[in-house]
Curated annotation (Swiss-Prot):
The modification N6-(pyridoxal phosphate)lysine is found at residue 240. It is an enzyme of class 2 (transferase). It catalyses: L-aspartate + 2-oxoglutarate = oxaloacetate + L-glutamate. Its cofactor is pyridoxal 5'-phosphate. GO terms for cellular component: cytoplasm. This is Aspartate aminotransferase. The gene is aspC. It comes from Sulfurisphaera tokodaii (strain DSM 16993 / JCM 10545 / NBRC 100140 / 7). It is found in: Cytoplasm.
Amino acid sequence: MPVDDFSLSANSISGESTLVYQDVARQVQKTKGIRIINFGIGQPDLPTFARIREAAKKSLDEGFTGYTSAYGIDELRQKIAEHLSSKYESVRKEEVIVTPGAKTALYLAFLLYINPGDEVIIFDPSFYSYAEVVKMLGGVPVYVKMKFNESTGFSLNLSELESKINKKTKMIVLNNPHNPTGMVFDPIEIEKLMEITKEKKVLLLSDEIYDYFIYEGKMKSVLEDPDWRDYVIYVNGFSKTFSMTGWRLGYVVAKEKVIKKMAEIAANIYTCPTSFAQKGALAAFESFDEVKEMISLFKKRRDIMYEELKKIKGIQVHKSQGAFYMFPFIGEILKKANLSVKDFSLKLIEEKGVTTIPGEVFPLEVGKDFVRLSFAVKEDDIREGIKRMKEFIDMLMTP
């Protein structure tokens, strides 16, 4: 059999992701010598906090380098449960599994429930991996278009969501705060979504990885519902909040029976999360002072990016309330320049050395008139990058 005769599952994945544009940027920097301003990266630009690094080093020096339980170490599971219980409804250690990154947590959740032909409702736009994994498992992504208004941002469009729930619907995916839009959804909307999910007897997979990145308003977590065990699969992790993207640690919270089944799957896929990384994560909970400082810094950066984007003619932008992304509408510019959003992003890299992520990466249709910019970069780079972006757009608009 030819080595390139891949499975249906493998062939169902497109491979289009934010990383493609990072590769283009690296090539441009190498060949043209342009200093890249990277608004495409989806991670904090700060190093992992010192006490976390030191805890991991200490565990290495003490020889904590073997396998752990597939569930993760008990101390970390307990600390996660205590932390969430202090904010929301009660969570027990037995209702937590630690995973190698939040993406793995999402994969376990989909793998546990999705059979071929099952439908999964995903808001459009959304993080691209949701739909890719659903397709890989033979499921069918069903998209609900979010509504955009420059003054109020994006809303969930729950009436359309209700109309798309049928006997094949297995799950609804929620991401709050939201990538790529930077929205923190109205708590009333989230409450209504939770009610719909329970009423229709479908699962709610809630990805709350950006839960500390909130600049205005209040976020409502699905774990605030006393009945969360009946329908919620909750995903979070350490990558964003503690600037630990390369450490690859996430976790799932769900009913104990669900966690047990996930652990069985985990033991046969990756055995366990990295031992010494878990010791580092345990130290993360000792203080949130650095987190608060980072959020304050990112809020200032957000304000700068918003004000600079507002100066560009033809752009509509809502000031994001959460995560670390701005998602401006550039549909008028694309139309006048006769460009797709993908071509816009590629040309912006090639000609000005500025990396953005075209909204079409976040399927399916809504994003085709938007680009995503991360403000997890230095203030001077934000100003310089938006200046270059304005020059590029002015050039496109010149007859």
